[in-house]
Amino acid sequence: MGAFKITNRFCPVHPLHKLISKRGGVWVRKRSIFYNALLLTGVNLLLRGVSMVFQVYLSRRIGAAGVGLLQLVLTVETAAITFGLSGTRVAAMYLCAEEYGRRRLDGVRSALAHCLCFGAVCSVLTGAALLFGSEWIADTWLHEPLASGCLRITALALPLRCCAAILSAYFTACGQVRRLVRVDVIERLSCLALTMFLLLAFAGDSPTETCSAVLLGSIFTEAAACAALGVMICRDLRGHSPRAGLHMGQRMAKLCLPLAASDYLRSGLRTIEQFLIPWGLMRAGGSYEAAMAEYGMFGGMVFPVLMFPAAFLYALSDLLVPELARSRAEGNRMRVQHLTQKCLRMGLLFAGAVAGGLFALAPWLGQAIYGLDTPGRLLRILSPMVLSLYMDAIVDGMLKGLGEQVSCVRYNTITMAMDVLLLRALLPRFGLAAYLLSFAVTHLVNFALSLRRLLAVTGHTPDIRYAVRALLCTAGAAAAAFSVFGPGLWPILLGRTALFAVSFAGLLRLTGTLERSDTVWLRQALRGH
């Protein structure tokens, strides 16, 4: 499970969205989408923080090479979940949001039933394929025959994971974020506690035993969470039979086919990319252990830190899908343009703050978290990429909410194919530098294509001068933070953080980048109006 409704003063909304529940807790007064995003963000940051501590523990227990093997196993699991869902989670979110926006709970139930049935078929078939192919994948791709047991665990639990993902889409679509958050928090914390128990009680120091403990801990707790979500949905939709005449199967197919094609291509190419990295690093002159250590350093240690603050944007991206779907169903073009403007502007400020902060703090963060210099150096190199990575998360959510799944298929195909070709050609010759170059180029191209399509669909004209001012504020605040020096790790880290935050806020106000209307809107959004 996982990821702004603007104030009425700025953009009126249909009175339907202000209904208060009188039965089953279904019709609820909707808070701002930004407020819901902040709620999800706070929870996700807490859970990501706990997970990062757990990741540090794993890296010290099994080493960077062991973390690399664990990342490859989880890559296979992610690919299996993608094929098992086949676009049904986003389709469920989109269709439930449309039916909820028209106040048709029988339509919501019909949408959920169709998506669950289709997801069950896809996940069972995918799980069976993974179950029977586990030994071949472990030998050929993972180069670790003992990892086949981990893959079999993943295969058996796949239908359950996909069911939980589809059920969670209902709560996001209907604006019931708090209920989803409660279940998510309990499930994630229970998962970490159970995993730690399994690690300490039964698992040794081998990566395969560690991976099995991680998978089993998540499976048991996700089963309980799935049951809890199912019970809540049954209570909400009690007395509402699936409605006929809505052509729900056709509508679902129209969404799932392009979504599944996009996800298949993206996941397939991403999986190939992930397996190409250790292969290319070995061809560049390193041993298998050294290649897995470099891969684990980037994928399991640096990238989680780089994307840690993105919890807000992924939550916002998830919430934008149903919000824009409702606005599009109502024909409210003005609200779509307003959301586009606010999301792009606030997203750029947030991404700029994170990029500048990471650039100024990277070496000390690497030492503070992992006690190593290499993660900090890689983090500083990648920090400018935060701008395109974070903004792409917002743009992707808006495109899905506007029904632009086919465009997402096209852009993902182009950029992922570029990624694989660049890695295949450059990685054996230039090693990790080639991977960093490929990562930067393909993500920039994807963001540029997606943004171009979003602007064409919404009719929004971006303010280039605003973007330039925001980037200059980021650079100025980062430069100011470099003036802090000291003898110890934590004094420098805390001093640079404080000076960067003060400088960034001051420059935003001084240059007029953060306008009074923005602060008023943020204040009202924080209150949830």
Segment roles from a protein language model:
Residues 119, 123-268:
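Hydrophobic transmembrane helix module of multi-pass membrane transport proteins
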Residues 47, 55, 86-93, 153-172, ...:
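Short runs within selected transmembrane alpha-helices of multi-pass transporters and secretion channels
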